[in-house]
């Protein structure tokens, strides 16, 4: 009975979304995107698309999303939004971070990316335009991937903070007490594999088109670079997402070393009480800001 009701609610929600979608004006970018997509399919093999296409998407988006935070350090106006104002970025730390990123991206992540083609072949994941999902189904699946990754990340991240193993693996990521965007994937190779597994679980369970791989990469990079940015920017549209952790939530984890273990959402920290120190800190901060107004 409950299952039938759930299916009925889901069907009604799908119909409602489809109806709203039919009322929206036609996307002027759809035709150019369709032509570009078909050009890619006609001129490159599936292996090239899945491997080199995925690598280009990851590298281009990673450093593009890092760029605003990198530029903020040169803009005096933005300093008031920096969370840990007493710990500015240094060229030495950023250069060290960049070198480790290149190693992780090309020596750890690239071999994993090379398996993308074989994954799509094994599970018969389509590439063609005709079977590309509608935007709302794509967003729904990306949200599902985010929930799965966040759950994996919370428990494995918390495990990596265990006193017996912390110094061997996760300590690398905590070398910078005040995070900055480029540091999002600065980690021990084993951590890259352990926490990165959460990214792929959602893909294995939910992927119905190769575009989901790239859409999920885009969302995950945007989120992880945002929470590592070190800046709490007003009117950040990501903060409109219910239960979104945000930069202050994760910045406290780097500052305090314990608590706030989740990557994207706040519910696991709230359920297990691992945000108690953060909540106390936040209350003190807000009281102090009121006094100084």
Swiss-Prot record:
Q: What's the gene?
A: MSMO1
Where found, per UniProt?
Endoplasmic reticulum membrane
> Can you cite an annotated GO cellular component?
endoplasmic reticulum membrane
Q: What is its main location?
A: endoplasmic reticulum
Specify the species: Homo sapiens (Human)
What this protein is called in its record is Methylsterol monooxygenase 1
> Which EC number(s) does UniProt give?
1.14.18.9
Role: Catalyzes the three-step monooxygenation required for the demethylation of 4,4-dimethyl and 4alpha-methylsterols, which can be subsequently metabolized to cholesterol. Also involved in drug metabolism, as it can metabolize eldecalcitol (ED-71 or 1alpha,25-dihydroxy-2beta-(3-hydroxypropoxy)-cholecalciferol), a second-generation vitamin D analog, into 1alpha,2beta,25-trihydroxy vitamin D3; this reaction occurs via enzymatic hydroxylation and spontaneous O-dehydroxypropylation.
Q: Which residues form the Fatty acid hydroxylase domain?
A: 145-274
